[in-house]
A protein has these predicted regions:
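Conserved radical SAM core fold
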Residues: 12-13, 48-50, 76-82, 92-110, ...
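Conserved Radical SAM active-site core
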Residues: 1-91, 259-264
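Short, solvent-exposed loop/turn segments at secondary-structure boundaries
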Residues: 17-19, 105-108, 142, 172-177
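Auxiliary Fe-S-binding modules of radical SAM enzymes
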Residues: 144-264
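Conserved glycine-rich "GG(E/T)P / GGGxP" loop and the immediately following alpha-helix
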Residues: 33-61, 100-118, 127, 133-152
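Hydrophobic faces of well-ordered beta-strands that scaffold small-molecule active sites
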Residues: 41, 69-71, 92-94, 129-131, ...
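Alpha-helical scaffolding segments of alpha/beta enzyme cores, especially the outer helices
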Residues: 28-31, 53-64, 80, 84-87, ...
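Short, well-ordered coil/turn segments that N-cap beta-strands
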Residues: 37-39, 65-67, 88-90, 125-129, ...
Length: 264
């Protein structure tokens, strides 16, 4: 897979001799994580299936120490690799860039979307799954609507991250996506996928989790200037919206990092 717009091309396409590699055994990575107070280890840039055996060893070592494991993946896997990856992970984020063979072939070079759709369907049934869709110009309401319906048919509670992509690599001269147009499209699509998020721009307002019934902010996040977000408010009461008592499908437990960082 060779994404035309890869925002990590400066790493992924960099000649090996120019990269200051650091060789770490799984035990060392886990030791570093524990000393840093980390509760999870995530492959967020590296595609885990490129070095799946190493990833599986790291995941097994981490789980022995009570550390959660997750990854971001393109989802282009064999059934065997998919099953092993899901067994090793507590959570997955799969990138769904389009929903036709033609678009995927144009954007990435692969000729069939079937393995990716299969990965999403299977992963949603065995572990916590979230999906990210990069958006670039020209923005298509039809394309986003099709992806939204596909996800909703599998499980309408799957979190969907719509990423305003700032193209690099072969499309580095492409214009940045229109924020207002994307927001207008997502306004209606949230009726199908209530846990839809939109970010990667300064002042992003679409990063918080809203109660699908009353619209109350139950988990508040702010934009950090990049594609990330910082959690600043956790308003759930026993996993439910404090306003209308609706159960919110959150996986895992809330950790108050601010108090941990202050030593309390």
């Amino acid at each position: 897979m060779d994404c035309k717009y890869c925002s990590n091309a400066y790493i992924a396409k960099c000649p090996v001799e120019e990269v200051p590699l650091m060789h770490l055994f799984p035990e060392k990575v886990v030791t570093i994580a524990k000393k840093s107070g980390c509760q999870s280890i995530v492959f967020a840039i590296n595609e885990p299936t490129v070095s799946l055996p190493s990833f599986l060893k790291l995941a097994a070592t981490a789980k022995k120490e009570g550390i959660l494991v997750g990854c971001l993946t393109n989802g282009y896997l064999t059934n065997t690799s998919l099953q092993k990856l899901c067994e090793a992970c507590d959570f997955l984020n799969i990138s769904l860039k389009a929903l036709t063979d033609e678009e995927y072939a144009d954007l990435t070079g692969i000729t069939s979307i079937s393995p990716i759709c299969n990965s999403i369907t299977y992963a949603s049934s065995v572990c916590h799954l979230e999906i990210t869709t990069p958006v670039l110009e020209p923005i298509s309401s039809e394309k986003l609507g099709k992806i939204c319906r596909f996800i909703a048919q599998i499980n309408p509670e799957i979190p969907w991250h719509v990423l305003r992509l700032l193209p690099e690599y072969m499309l580095k001269d492409a214009p940045p996506p229109d924020i207002q147009k994307i927001e207008q499209i997502l306004h209606d699509l949230r009726k199908m996928l209530p846990y839809t998020y939109f970010g990667n721009y300064v002042g992003a307002q679409g990063l918080s989790t809203l109660c699908p019934v009353c619209g109350n902010i139950v988990i508040e996040r702010i934009n950090t200037g990049t594609c990330g977000g910082r959690l600043i408010g956790y308003n759930l009461s026993n996993g439910k919206c404090p306003h209308c008592n609706t159960k919110i499908p959150i996986t895992g437990n809330y950790v108050d990092w601010e108090h941990l960082e202050n030593g309390s």
